[in-house]
Amino acid sequence: MPINKSEKPESCDNVKVVVRCRPLNEREKSMCYKQAVSVDEMRGTITVHKTDSSNEPPKTFTFDTVFGPESKQLDVYNLTARPIIDSVLEGYNGTIFAYGQTGTGKTFTMEGVRAVPELRGIIPNSFAHIFGHIAKAEGDTRFLVRVSYLEIYNEEVRDLLGKDQTQRLEVKERPDVGVYIKDLSAYVVNNADDMDRIMTLGHKNRSVGATNMNEHSSRSHAIFTITIECSEKGIDGNMHVRMGKLHLVDLAGSERQAKTGATGQRLKEATKINLSLSTLGNVISALVDGKSTHVPYRNSKLTRLLQDSLGGNSKTMMCANIGPADYNYDETISTLRYANRAKNIKNKARINEDPKDALLRQFQKEIEELKKKLEEGEEISGSDISGSEEDDDEEGEVGEDGEKRKKRRDQAGKKKVSPDKMIEMQAKIDEERKALETKLDMEEEERNKARAELEKREKDLLKAQQEHQSLLEKLSALEKKVIVGGVDLLAKAEEQEKLLEESNMELEERRKRAEQLRRELEEKEQERLDIEEKYTSLQEEAQGKTKKLKKVWTMLMAAKSEMADLQQEHQREIEGLLENIRQLSRELRLQMLIIDNFIPRDYQEMIENYVHWNEDIGEWQLKCVAYTGNNMRKQTPVPDKKEKDPFEVDLSHVYLAYTEESLRQSLMKLERPRTSKGKARPKTGRRKRSAKPETVIDSLLQ
């Protein structure tokens, strides 16, 4: 639908939060764990029971949408992701991310089983949805779709589609673009199959490991970004470009070392994962708390990349995944509280119209220029070329007229020629070559000149043909990147789009029925309350008051239990942070031990004076390191020296006169800067010195 450039609609929405509970897995069944979570999809509530304490009341949380263990992938997509992707196609930014404890089904929700259409997750279903929308668009609408895939592993940003997946990328920020990744590769795609292949390639490069709670545990946060640019005519008659970005985020799960059994590298990964998720929680708390003046986006790479998604220019949906087993009661409650806070975040999303970093307009401009060049080539008349072809026998002329004729020939050779004209010229050259061979009365010199002229014209013609072919190939490549609306691009994804449409229609009918049942239920409850208010005797009134008192008492006990749980959770968070601090302190002490034993104190102070913290890459950098040490030695030119006499003896290291002063200076050079532990900096050739240099000098001089 055309949009007026002067109007930039902005919508202020809360982050939409949904909760999905997976069924008990085989391990939990074999260990005889009990179901502690009950889901009421109609009311949108999740109730958690503490099975080992019958006196404690259950805790109930309410969300926009909830899904039970029997929920289908298509229903999850249509109810949660479809509205976000529709907004992205209109030009808004959108973010969908899954959060939860490790092993709760986040990756299944986001990716699913791509080989089975009914089990595909949000990411592959979005592919079919996007290209289904493009196929239904009007014919004068142009689209450009590109994708990128990155992971955040141990606080390092890596490109999953790049040649070197271990290379660290820098996080940058510009006022006109916002936060972006420098040198992140992006690929233009033409259909859903291309997207699926790229995602499969990136998924193979992702960091995955096994723990006690999950055999295929994600050890990094992954962000799959789809950028959709759309060009169409506005009300003012001009072409306008809208650009929507869709971030599909699969977060690594929070975990406890006691449950996962993580050690070594897995433990380091878990520490970094928990730190970034803790920062994400702090960001959410700061956004919800109206008194907070600072939001710690920069404390983690994850929160910095999701800066727009949380409280910025984006429509965001968070899917909190929980496990049903009583074994994970604390983690389930923590996740639900986390999600409950997130639904209070307000985002201000606006349509990105005519953005500076849009590629679609640039591609369209290049296509127009190439078409213009090709059209100019076909409009050239044959008279411009024939002038140089008719004067072969006048090639020997010199003077002003000859120079002018030569210039005209050069200019004619540079002009673009149509394909038909090229064929005619080639035929004419062949005829002239045959005629030249048959002329016997020509001198050898004239024959050679004429032959050279023919070869030159043939080369010019071949060059023109190559330029024409190159322009055609470039035009074809650019036109393939720009997708025309209304063209069927679904291919294999057509069946998936049909499944999504059918599921969406069925879901709409179920939603209407559920709404009707909810209204009837509310009416019945209201009738029951009215009946309870009408007491026929004092005894009935006493019973009614007792019931109300019990309800209030239950609510009071639930509030007390909630307070106690919050205190316990706060204590657990503190313990977790303290454990992280202890781990970091151990690493810091190890580094300091290495520094104190191998770098002298004087050099340490010098290094500290010349280092600075780089916020973009999150590490310390040494100033002017390019002008030091081996870097300078490599660049220093070696002065030209005459070849040495092979029989000449090098006496530069020999003392020709042993004076007291020269001996003292040479031995004083042995003293070097010492480390903070009192040890001298080791030389390349180690020598044991039992006495100080002054003692050695005095003994030698006696």
UniProtKB/Swiss-Prot annotation:
What family does this chain come from, according to its entry?
Belongs to the TRAFAC class myosin-kinesin ATPase superfamily. Kinesin family. Kinesin II subfamily.
For region Globular, the annotated ranges are: 600-702
Originating organism: Macaca fascicularis (Crab-eating macaque)
* Job description of the protein: Microtubule-based anterograde translocator for membranous organelles. Plus end-directed microtubule sliding activity in vitro. Plays a role in primary cilia formation. Plays a role in centriole cohesion and subdistal appendage organization and function. Regulates the formation of the subdistal appendage via recruitment of DCTN1 to the centriole. Also required for ciliary basal feet formation and microtubule anchoring to mother centriole.
Biased amino acid composition, Acidic residues: 376-400
Phosphoserine: residues carrying this PTM: S690
Stretches the record annotates as Disordered: 372-424, 667-702
Mind telling me what this protein is named? Kinesin-like protein KIF3A
Q: Where is the Kinesin motor domain?
A: 14-345
- Subunit composition? Heterodimer of KIF3A and KIF3B. Interacts with CIMAP3. Interacts with CLN3. Interacts with DCTN1. Interacts with FLCN. Interacts with AP3B1.
One GO MF term, please? ATP binding
Looking up SUPFAM superfamilies in the UniProt record yields: P-loop containing nucleoside triphosphate hydrolases
Tell me one Pfam family matched here. Answer: Kinesin
Record's compositionally biased regions (Basic and acidic residues): 410-424
What keywords does the record list, in alphabetical order? ATP-binding, Cell projection, Cilium, Cilium biogenesis/degradation, Coiled coil, Cytoplasm, Cytoskeleton, Microtubule, Motor protein, Nucleotide-binding, Phosphoprotein
The cellular location(s) given in this protein's UniProt record come to:
Cytoplasm, Cytoskeleton; Cell projection, Cilium; Cytoplasm, Cytoskeleton, Microtubule organizing center, Centrosome, Centriole
Example of a GO biological process term: centriole-centriole cohesion
> Which residues does the annotation say bind ATP?
G100, Q101, T102, G103, T104, G105, K106, T107
Q: Which Gene3D superfamilies match?
A: Kinesin motor domain
InterPro entries hit by this protein? Kinesin-like_fam, Kinesin_motor_CS, Kinesin_motor_dom, Kinesin_motor_dom_sf, P-loop_NTPase
Residue ranges that the Swiss-Prot or TrEMBL entry lists as coiled coil: 355-593
